[in-house]
Amino acid sequence: MKLFYAPGACSLSPHIALLESGLEATLVKVDTKAHKTEGGGDYYAVNPKGYVPLLELDDGDRLTEGPAIVQYIADRNPKSKLAPAAGTMERYHLQEWLNFITAELHKQFSPLFQAATPAEYKETLKEKIGKRFDWVAEQLKGKDYLMGDTFTVADAYLFTMLIWTKHVGIDLARWPVLAAYKVRIAARPKVREAMIAEGLIKQNDPVAA
């Protein structure tokens, strides 16, 4: 398999999932502004949507949306417990989380990274994200992970959103539960491995809040 990614982008989520699952995959770095792969290829030829992540399977089939990709990864190694079994209520709750993170968090964050987004609109988006964080923090009270005691692909996705906060001026100190959760996820060996591989942290960096 090949995972097409950009450092620190939402593709960090499936990158973490791959490492946690123990599955082997080749990483292909993408410059999402130039739409070029690290080898100089036209990324649009790989993914006409132009964004990451993209998972290319060994048979040439391709998946291009994060929630689909991470569930595919989880299902390839059920022993990893990265996703509950298909058809169970627990799986539907996982999908509920993935959909929430996609629609209510990820899509609110994206314009915050765009220089052309008006400052007033950015503040509106931050307020919306804050309200969503209020709710997520309530759900996490008394739990280590979104689904309880087990780390799942939903946690990898939420963690990715949380590390974005420092880049857009959102202070997690307002949500101690989320701040502690972020540190807890960041301390996982495979999460650190993914972040080191993407150049987000260095080998000897301490777990940062």
Role assignments for model-derived ranges:
Residues 1-127, 137:
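GST-like domain detector, emphasizing the conserved glutathione-binding G-site
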